[in-house]
């Protein structure tokens, strides 16, 4: 068995390909009560109530109740913290291809600081968690949450 994701192990050739789509940001459609979808930069969530689901207007996406448009910051955050769950980590070139900015342009010194503290490593194009980084993964991933200037201002005045 080998570890292919922070909380998943598998025999060679048996890693879950289904979940890999979530961790790499592939768009997906969910059907049924309480299902979630990620389509066209929007996260959808279906109702959990059968009656509401069955009587949904035809123009609704299979009875969705919530639609949350994702900002580019939302998508960059998810790219980083979902990608860092995987032992393969995140690719600098894939980040740049997807967002037209480098990880350093977006996150400044954060990756280098995490590397200096032994929580993150870089090999070639990829950043990935070290064994100690896996133990402190919530902290590491929280470092990749982008705070808008409005949130920063509110935080300063609170």
Please identify what each model-predicted range represents:
Residues 126-130:
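Minor-groove-contacting beta-hairpin "wing" of winged helix-turn-helix DNA-binding domains
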Residues 51, 74-81, 108, 134, ...:
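Non-catalytic, well-ordered alpha-helical scaffold segments
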Residues 132-158:
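Short, amphipathic alpha-helical interaction segments positioned at domain boundaries
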Residues 115-125:
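A short, conserved structural fragment
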Residues 15-19, 117-118, 135:
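Short secondary-structure transition/capping segments
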Residues 1-101, 151-158:
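C-terminal scaffold of the Radical SAM
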């Amino acid at each position: 068995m080998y570890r292919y994701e922070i909380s998943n192990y598998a025999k060679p050739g048996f890693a879950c390909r289904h979940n890999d789509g979530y961790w790499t940001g592939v768009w997906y459609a969910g059907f049924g009560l309480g299902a979630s979808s990620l389509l066209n930069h929007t996260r959808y969530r279906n109702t959990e109530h059968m009656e509401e689901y069955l009587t949904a207007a035809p123009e609704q996406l299979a009875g969705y109740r919530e639609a949350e448009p994702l900002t580019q910051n939302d998508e960059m955050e998810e790219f980083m913290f979902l990608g860092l769950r995987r032992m393969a980590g995140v690719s600098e070139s894939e980040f740049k291809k997807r967002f037209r900015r480098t990880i350093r342009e977006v996150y400044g010194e954060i990756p280098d600081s995490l590397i200096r503290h032994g929580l993150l490593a870089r090999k070639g194009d990829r950043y990935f968690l070290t064994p100690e980084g896996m133990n402190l993964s919530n902290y590491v991933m929280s470092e990749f949450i982008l705070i808008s200037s409005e949130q920063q201002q509110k935080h300063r005045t609170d």
